[in-house]
Amino acid sequence: MTNTITENIYASIIHQVEKKENSGNEKTKAVLNQAVADLSKAASIVHQVHWYMRGSGFLYLHPKMDELMDALNGHLDEISERLITIGGAPFSTLKEFDENSRLEETVGTWDKSITDHLKRLVQVYDYLSSLYQVGLDVTDEEDDAVSNDIFTAAQTEAQKTIWMLQAELGQAPGL
């Protein structure tokens, strides 16, 4: 683990597991469920950008937000189903997503530029990439190759999305 965000997520997962009886894959269940909450919030944030963006680039970026939402929801479904497969219970209500996600939502406004929206999405995807790194670390520890593969695919897509968003902003990749 190399950055503070990743370390904080890992510490939070460990704290959740210490409260429970350890059955051998509790950390994996905890990080999968954290991903359920965070992916749900991330999809909501992208949806807000989709609705509230205005300006140059709208015609290209509006459908791109649909693609991002579809990808997030695909990861959400796969991660939730994996959690169920290994004996977990995914968060499934807006209240649970809100209480457990580390992503913050704000009320949509028309006064943000497309650049502001894209910078926010870079932050969201950077957080998700860090979360997926925790998932990789935890699933390595608990020897769960299937969940590890899921986190690898999700992190690969998150990092590609960061690169694409940063390129649209005229920035070099900051991974």
Swiss-Prot record:
Any one cellular-component term (Gene Ontology): cytoplasm
Triggers of expression: Induced by air.
GO process annotations (BP): intracellular iron ion homeostasis
Quaternary data: Homododecamer. The oligomer forms a hollow sphere and can store up to 480 Fe(3+).
Gene3D superfamilies: 1.20.1260.10
Catalytic reactions of this protein: 2 Fe(2+) + H2O2 + 2 H(+) = 2 Fe(3+) + 2 H2O
UniProt domain comment: 12 di-nuclear ferroxidase centers are located at the interfaces between subunits related by 2-fold symmetry axes.
GO molecular function terms noted in the UniProt entry: ferric iron binding; oxidoreductase activity, acting on metal ions
Binding-site residues for Fe cation 2, renumbered to this chain: E81
Superkingdom of the organism of origin: Bacteria
Subcellular location: Cytoplasm
InterPro entries associated with the record: DPS_DNA-bd, DPS_DNA-bd_CS, Ferritin-like, Ferritin-like_SF, Ferritin_DPS_dom
Recorded name of the encoding gene: dps
Entries under CDD domains matching the protein: DPS (cd01043)
Coiled coil spans: none
Name assigned to this protein: DNA protection during starvation protein
Keywords, comma-separated and alphabetical: Cytoplasm, Iron, Iron storage, Metal-binding, Oxidoreductase
UniProt-listed Enzyme Commission number(s): 1.16.-.-
